Amino acid sequence: MSTADRNQAGIYWQSRMGNNADGIGGNCHRYDIVTTDAQGQPVRGRLVVDYGIKIHNGGGAYDCSFPSPEALFARRGQPDPAHAPDALLLTHSHEDHLGALKHAIDMGYRLPPIHCAPFTAELVRKSLTSAGIIETDRRPEIHIVKPNETIMAGGAEVTFVPVDHLPGASALVIRTKEAAVFHSGDYKFDKTMALGDRADPELLRRIGKQGIDMVVSDSTAAGEERPKVSEREIGKHLQTIVAGQQGRAVVAGVLGTQLDRVVSLGRAAKASGRTLVVSGASLVQNIAAAERAGHSLEKAIGAPILLTKDARDLPADRALVVTTGAFAQPMAGLTRSADHQPGALYIGRDTTVIIPQRAIPPVAEAHRQMVERLDATGARVITAERAEEMGYGAIHQSGHAIASDTRLLYTLLKPRQVASPIHGAPGQIEANAEIARSVGIKPLVLRDNGAVVRVTSHGVDIVGREDLPRIGARETGDVKQLPRAKPGEGRRPRPPAIYRYDQLDSTGERIQSRNIEPYAGPARTPRPPRDLRVR
């Protein structure tokens, strides 16, 4: 589709990736803003919302895939293409929403200015640094946006509205004189979460009264009709579990960005006279990033957090050690312990392992195998499923809107035109659409990516469609050669991997071109990864 197809005034929305038949991930959306000047001529702006990866599991051809940057960003050293994006807006800091940034840069693209919340900005910087993108001229500008702040970007007013998901998570209200779109990002409603600003239903009601033409909303858990469990209730159930482990070591495995759950575990530790100990570089870095962004876990817990190196003299039954690995990621702490890897936390018959997170489909098999290996150590393993079977109650709740949350969002916003479900496979999208119908809102159901949707105050129409290629990325086995750190810069990250990039079709099933030349700098022979874990 040419830019001529976007000449009429309105907001043009396109899902570049995220509505995938093969599972959630790679979330990215393009918004073209078309207004008219005093002479009635079109004035164009462009926004990109999120740029994430889709993780591939199970030994396939690629480690991850993401939307092709070719039609989104400008290449370094080349003039800006017509209508290059004015801004990149990030809703939050999960990899499926920002993990492709480093890959686009390594492929030779220049990113537009990024606008996001403070914690999101911290994790963007961490992601780029860990990928070896340390040169200032390769890193994008990052502009911090405060909760409920409105910025001008691409010819639109964009308001970052706090939602409940993780620190700094934001929905976006994109408004022009022609139309208004509410882009939910990942969200749910839980006023008991400890970190960051909470979603405000009354604020959302006021936003709806100001006029919203289309709601673009998260579908991940829209089909779940089970009763919702708050983080406060999860915390109480964790307290009961931990209180019953007298004389035993307790180790909990979480996701690296699941910091509200870390707070709940910390409160459970405090209630039982234990000290929270954090193990694993990624989790330690994320907690420090949250602190810099104004989200203090120690303040929320009401007790200090120790690193493993500072807890050597702490008796095992007076600690609660939290590490990564809830999704059985290969290098995460809990996975390494299950595999008895050198330097990993010891888990044995006198250990209770708590995994307060349900496995999602892409990692279900790896998670099952990890739990089996933990069981084989003789440890007492309490997964989210087992906790309910044992009568403790729920210790996990989806971070995404379940059916009742989805219904509440639509009831508060009351879009004038349509609701369009995103961030889901076809079944999840249809469940979201059915909820919209049930409250009298017309759904616009797009079961795949590529449709171009024009939004105005008079109507919403599909005005075209594009086939959108993906990029498949796989580590080559080589690593980047980084220059020595200058005084005051701190230690360089471990040598980052160099990736091979292939262009795939819109389904990710067929290769269109191989070995797209990346920008990676000189390579050197890989060396074994340094063990970051403290015994």
Task: Label every model-predicted segment.
Residues 2-89, 94-271, 275-309, 336-341, ...:
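His/Asp/Glu-rich metal-coordinating catalytic cores
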Residues 223-361, 368-392, 398-521:
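Hard-cation-handling environments
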Residues 38, 522-525:
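Generic N-terminal simple sequence motifs
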